[in-house]
A protein has these predicted regions:
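Structural recognition of alpha->loop->beta junctions
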Residues: 125-143, 200-211
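Short beta->alpha connector loops
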Residues: 91-92, 116-121, 188-192
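Hydrophobic faces of well-ordered beta-strands that scaffold small-molecule active sites
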Residues: 20, 84-86, 112-114, 136-138, ...
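Alpha-helical scaffolding segments of alpha/beta enzyme cores, especially the outer helices
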Residues: 55, 59, 96-107, 124, ...
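Conserved alpha-helical substructure of the radical SAM core
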Residues: 3-88, 92-113, 123-127
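Short, well-ordered coil/turn segments that N-cap beta-strands
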Residues: 80-82, 108-110, 132-134, 178-180, ...
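Flexible, active-site-proximal loop/turn residues at the rims of small-molecule/cofactor binding pockets
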Residues: 41, 90, 120, 142, ...
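Radical SAM enzyme [4Fe-4S]-AdoMet core and its adjacent flexible, acidic
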Residues: 44, 48, 145-265, 269, ...
Length: 312
């Protein structure tokens, strides 16, 4: 069900891009303690079945096409184009399948972007990836190794993200795609809320820095108070030109999200877990969409005039 929340007017807002977030896998080489990428349901992840991937993308492209007046979302907002954002888990664990999906999405007229923890970005991969995406999203919660270890941002071999090497890869990405934009996602939690991330933001120079309060949809581990979250935001006021702040209420029922099994899914404020539709490639996007709750006004407020990829 698509709806406007109380206080949202009748005028249809417009966004340049409608962003569809497909979480292609739950698998990840990190074990972040507050990770929300945990979904119910059994079965093989859709990414590993090319026929189903193609059918899913065909359904999404047709249903969310800006000229599809049958989409109930068009009654509440308008948009000029579609962008497919691939997330995880860690989507680059399956980089060949990811690249194939990106290429197909672009062949259907969709824009493309990804969100990654950065650990699998190599020169060879960035040479293939950068020309396919308009934005590269990077999940980065701390510049401090001990905090990253505490959060769980460390792989099974004990390796942490090398920020210096990452910076070099990002420079290379720009040489492959001069129009590429960088977005950084930071989840404010009990371990990093006192950190000053200004130096690393100056080093990376993102076009957008999304600052999100840890969302208690799967676990309450490392939850942070409203006061501590707002203090983190205030500490980084000098970066307000690129900072986009989202508290928990802003993240409820306001993203277009598809899980690894090809279902629309959504979180609701004050509730644990997710609500799911049936698989989109099985019953079609139109039928699946009506099984699902979505706040068009909150979505439009986030994306209007903003260079963002979505939650990831």
């Amino acid at each position: 069900m698509v709806y406007l929340r109380s206080g949202e007017g009748a005028m249809r807002p417009h966004v340049s891009e409608l962003v569809i977030n497909w979480h292609i896998t739950e698998a990840c080489n990190y074990k972040c303690r507050y990770c929300y990428a945990k979904w119910d349901g059994a079965g093989r992840e859709l990414l590993h079945d090319w026929t189903r991937v193609r059918n899913l993308l065909d359904e999404l492209q047709a249903f969310f096409h800006p000229e599809n007046d049958a989409n109930p979302l068009s009654q509440h907002m308008t948009w000029s184009s579609i962008r497919l954002n691939l997330a995880g888990g860690e989507p680059l664990l399956y980089h060949d399948a990811l690249l194939r999906a990106l290429e197909y999405a672009r062949s259907k007229g969709m824009g493309a972007s990804i969100i990654t923890n950065g650990s699998r970005l190599t020169n060879d991969l960035i040479d293939r990836l950068a020309p396919l995406v308009s934005m590269l999203g990077l999940s980065l919660d701390s510049a401090d190794p001990s905090r990253n270890i505490g959060i769980g941002r460390i792989d099974s071999r004990g390796s942490l993200l090398d920020v210096d090497s990452l910076s070099e890869v990002l420079v290379r990405a720009k040489t492959q795609n001069s129009a590429l934009r960088l977005k950084v996602n930071t989840v404010v939690n009990a371990l990093n809320h006192q950190e000053d991330m200004t130096p690393i933001m100056h080093a990376l120079m993102p076009d957008r820095w999304k600052v999100l309060r840890m969302l208690q949809v799967v676990t309450s581990d490392l939850a942070v108070s409203s006061e501590d979250f707002l203090a983190f935001v205030a500490r980084h006021d000098a970066l307000r030109e690129v900072m986009c702040v989202e508290d928990n209420d802003d993240m409820s029922e306001s993203y277009i999200m598809v899980d690894p099994l090809g279902r629309f899914f959504q979180n609701t404020a004050g509730q644990k877990g997710y609500h799911y539709s049936s698989p989109i490639d099985v019953i079609g996007a139109e039928r699946a969409f009506i099984e699902w709750r979505f706040s068009a006004g909150t979505y439009a407020a986030r994306y209007r005039d903003a260079l963002v990829v979505g939650r990831e």
